[in-house]
């Protein structure tokens, strides 16, 4: 049930957007993706601060590309962002049957074997444009706990969370707020799996500057400490949108050997190398609009200019 406060005029535009997404979700899958590409192309032409952020990130991470090549990549990236928006509608409202039909899940046995140890499993992933739909696909194959950050818009947060909590595979999966470390520990000690994406700029206590594409980046190094505390296995998880409207592929690695390693920084670098390989494989699907290289202090360069605010 939607609380009455969300009927206030300040939410009317949000309701309009939700209505549009509800209509888009009813389209055939190829037409849904085409609607997303169209929305992305419109967004690409708007004077939004995301564009210079994405350009700066591409220049830093992919210096081997020419300016023209990076602009073409930027075009494809905004199409991917638009498709991601429409895929959120599928994540919230589509049936399990539709989701399963469009998806291929690899490595579930790796997760089952990890949980057979009895100490839980941490599923590490990164922010690509299939992040939301990928979590829904993974949950169609295996119950998971998802670490998430609620949207700033309270109405979107209410709708997203209510639908996330409704995904079932025998039982509801749980959502854990991003800063709820105790909630993560409790889930792992119950021998459950916890999915989270600690790849974005992290400037809180415990952050370290760890190279990403060879550039120091504020990084969350808590994963190895969490694994050490709980004894949980750590697995890498990739997700991608296949070309030609072929659906999605998600893949879970075998548990990482020697993890945690000699230091939390080395473990974080290992994860960053995994992300770098994925970025090079499907560059248009990476979340380029995030200010990944914001430093921990003014001692580090400002790569984004006015967009860094």
Language-model segment annotations:
Residues 108-112, 135-136, 160-161, 165, ...:
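Short amphipathic alpha-helical segments and helix-helix/interface helices
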Residues 26, 61-64, 141, 167, ...:
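Alpha-helical structural context
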Residues 1-125, 130, 157-163:
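Membrane-anchoring hydrophobic helices of lipid-metabolizing enzymes
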Residues 106, 147, 251-253:
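Residues in well-ordered beta-strands of folded domains
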Residues 3-8, 37-39, 43, 50, ...:
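Non-catalytic C-terminal accessory region of glycerolipid acyltransferases
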Residues 117-178, 190, 201-213, 241:
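Catalytic core of membrane glycerolipid acyltransferases/transacylases, capturing the structured
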